[in-house]
Amino acid sequence: MKPVIALVGRPNVGKSTLFNRLTRSRDALVADLPGLTRDRHYGEGRTGERPYLVVDTGGFEPVAKDGILHEMARQTRQAVEESDIVVFIVDGRNGLAPQDKSIADYLRKVGRPIFLVVNKAEGMKYSTVAADFYELGLGDPRAISAAHGDGVTEMINEALEVAYAGQPEENDDEKAARGVKIAIVGRPNVGKSTLINALVGEERVIAFDMPGTTRDSIYVDFERGGKPYTLIDTAGLRRRGKVFEAIEKFSVVKTLQSISDANVVILLLDARQDISEQDAHIAGFVVEQGRALVVGVNKWDGLDPHVRERTKADLERKLKFLDFAKFHFISAAEKTGIGPLMRSVDDAYAAAMAKLPTPKLTRALIDAVEFQQPRRRGPVRPKLRYAHQGGQNPPIIVIHGNALDAITETYKRYLENRFRETFKLTGTPLRIEFRSSTNPYADKA
């Protein structure tokens, strides 16, 4: 599982600046899709081969008793409790504040590794910057500049060494034995535990493990139609005998960890409730992570035909950025629609892992350009020459040519749809990257 790093500190110490620096590489991968809802408090970072999740907790007032500050404090405490590492940020320019002491008092009790980070330290001597903060009792402060990047890489590498220590690595045989890893996500009371029980069946549970650490997730291995699958707990499930029950507390952090760990995500919605902002946030994170996706609309049984039509229209309008995914209208309680849902899981996984040969990709690109040329930008018309695959899960198609920075988002979507149609890539996000030739004589060759 990807470790979770919580950024904690009083308001205006630079948490959002550090968050943006740590996650910017991920943000750059995803174009703004129409209707896509993002929650800017959660993101993914990567240092070398080590990915991690980052939570920006907002301004933390640990003694707040009511109002929005109290709610922010509650959310921060939950994020800290579910994190692997806490980065406690203080302001090197303004020095030690009473709020810093209150936060430090709280953090010393949470039982997590704490990295005390003094931000805005650019141009200052370390001894001067650090002096005030030793009295917090959290070890040696680390001086950084989130705005300029000074010291950030060293600090995050040190944090990841601690976070990854002792995490077992699965080999290829172990991954194959697990089969397709599925995360069932959704807000409370949509029927996640009911669907899990319908999928797994009481006698089909091969293994159930609930480790004591917050980092580890519950894996439920099962077979369906002779194929191995692994369900990843996202709800915080409790086992009563042979039946799984949902714990009502909704954990954003665990949901994001499970999405990151999955091969395919089933986003479960409640047909009897409106699509919420929380639903859209979860869906947006699935897209940003590039995960294969199937949408299950639960509690479909017994709905009036007019309500069904209205629900379908609502889904199409509010989740239009999920147009690559299959929607299934099911009843987990009645076990209806589950077979087709699982077939779409298999199809989405196959699409996410598809191998796309360079000759076929290039042929599809040439056919698409012949059917519809990209628009000129001034005197320049982009020239698309060839394409190759740059990755899987999600599929990445790299297109080479000239003046490709003039390609519009509309034309990019057109190419995506052509590639999807040609290679039957349903159920997975698709990334398209453009690489222009830097040779000024390339057009004359």
UniProtKB/Swiss-Prot annotation:
Q: Which InterPro entries match?
A: AAA+_ATPase, G_ENGA, GTP-bd, GTPase_Der, KH_dom-like, KH_dom-like_a/b, P-loop_NTPase, Small_GTP-bd
Residue positions binding GTP 2: 186-193, 233-237, 298-301
Question: Is this entry keyworded Mitochondrion?
Answer: no
PROSITE patterns for the chain: G_ENGA
Give GO BP annotations, semicolon-separated. Answer: ribosome biogenesis
GO molecular function ontology, one term from the record = ATP hydrolysis activity
Occurrences of domain KH-like (ranges): 354-438
UniProt keyword list:
GTP-binding, Nucleotide-binding, Repeat, Ribosome biogenesis
Q: What does the annotation say about its assembly with partners?
A: Associates with the 50S ribosomal subunit.
Q: What is this protein called?
A: GTPase Der
Question: What species was this sequence derived from?
Answer: Paraburkholderia xenovorans (strain LB400)
